[in-house]
Amino acid sequence: MKKVLGICVLCVSVSLSTNAQNNEFENAYNAFRQQAIKEYEDFREKANKEYADFMRQAWKSYQSLPEIPKPKDEPPVPPTPYPKDDKDKPIKDTPKPYEEVIPITEPEPQPKPVAPIREQSQPEENYFRFTFFQTGCKVRLDESHRFTLKDCQMNTLAEAWERLAGNEYNNAIRDCLELRIHHRLCDWGYLLMLQELSDAYLGRETNESALLCAYLYCQSGYQMRLGMGNNRLYLLVASKHQIYESGYWEIDGMFYYPFNCQEQSLEICGASFPNEQPLSLLVNENPLLVEKPTGSRVLQAEYFPDARANVTSDENLISFFATYPTSMLDDNFCTRWSFYANTPMSERIKKQLYPSLQKTIQGKSQYEAANVLLNFVQTAFVYEYDDKVWGGDRAFFAEESLYYPYCDCEDRSILFSRLVRDLLGLKVLLVYYPGHLATAVCFTDNVTGDYISLNNQKYVVCDPTYIGAPVGATMPDMDNGKAKVILLQ
């Protein structure tokens, strides 16, 4: 009995000792966590204080640089019909030269706040509601958060920034970042959402709206500058991309683009924020918006009638795409097409389009299946020049070609590249010739025809604008000596 009692006492002692150690560890961890949070908050508070101090003095006059015009390409090559007598003739293997390879534009993580922004508990949560492409959104802002600028002077702006930097706006920032995640917003979409929120809350295109938008954008981790001109405040957005047809300012080697500004001369605050990141114009996934179906449209391949689909587009998504600015990277206008081609189609449109195409290509070889998809893009759509329809060059995201009544060679190539990657799982290149855009597919089966050799892999030419042409046929009179190969994800 004494032995059993001794064991029980020992077990209780060990248990108490273990609990004490656990409590000691938990207390140490909580103390460390609170210290880390305080250091983060102190760092962000210090950064905002220094920024406000700079706003009282660090303004310089800048002249905008002239806008970059959209590139004047060679006259577009019209769609050419493939000789029907040659339709079933085999095409021999013919290597094609090219001049340049445009590398893949890899996506990067989106910017994030310079320090974690702590939730501020409130006795009652009040929300401001607004719409973004007809999609309801809400953030924690109420009447007490509204502010008015008495003028557009440095001290007034600095004082307003100091007020915004108080903890009372923390929940609004957190809500905006939550909306970015929930609605799958790219950087461009997030900027548009912040503008819509600020305009709805403080008045469209007011100085107050511009300052709130700039503050939310900056605190989310993005690089921006503030500009003043004719008693108006403007948000200038730093971008990795060179945006066409927009004046811009160059500050410390970075290009800044105006948001709703036509001024040629501005006083610009050169103050920077820690770890700020420029805007990316990559659209890695479609935004999640309330769906507004358009009228239906029947699309059908000429040679493969079973490749037929009835599709309705989403008007809100199409409206979002229409806001997207055309741009390039590294002064290379060929980079722009990959931005469109690498954007996936929405799950909604895939469910309408893909089952019919999958059923038609089921059981076929890669060559046969690619011919079905190629003929679908060649013959289900009406060709027209951008100059005639849009008054200038206008590339489409793949989904836009399913909505608009006309498309050209670049739109067809972007759409075909998307279909092949999604339905066949094969790698695709875009091939730019002066005045024309086509594709080339890396088959894992043995497929013959005109091809491009890259990294010991064979990419067979597929031209969605060479009407009726099979896989492997290059449109006549293409200058491969000046061809540029554009890699896709």
Task: Label every PLM stretch briefly.
Residues 4-14:
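Sec-dependent N-terminal signal peptides
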Residues 30-33, 37, 41-220:
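Long, contiguous, compositionally biased segments that the model treats as domain-scale units
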Residues 36, 40, 44-47, 51, ...:
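Sec/Tat-exported extracytoplasmic proteins
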Residues 196-198, 208, 212-214, 218-358:
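Extended, non-transmembrane interaction/recognition domains
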Residues 200-213, 222, 384-438, 442-444:
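Active-site neighborhood of thiol-dependent amide/isopeptide-bond enzymes
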Residues 224-253, 361-364, 411-489:
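Hydrophobic/aromatic-rich core segments of domains that either
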